[in-house]
């Protein structure tokens, strides 16, 4: 579950935004954050409201600080991607909370309701991860160190060139 959300979330974000200033580590963190509540069922982090509130706070706190904002936007982007990659909209009472329902429906979170499909998704996540490792040149120690230190991918890879 975690590999699927973290890796595919980062790759999808890169494919859409291709931003050199975005912290892709925060995208991965945002994408796996809702999994932390999964043992107790789908709760607040599986709602559309959670990433929207995080986005609002980031927009307010980073007013006038464009680069700081761009870096931190990875967190709500990852949280939104979790909802997409999880199919969270199919649990409408939770997804639209508190609009459709004032309480969370008891039961398992989407991550635990798939059974073996969760393993299949993680294997797919590993395959995407191998592709991304090569595509972003993370076998190069300098590029890998930069990614681990700053969360940024090498500019030549982000803008479509091969370094």
Could you tell me what each predicted segment is?
Residues 1-163:
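N-terminal membrane-targeting hydrophobic helices
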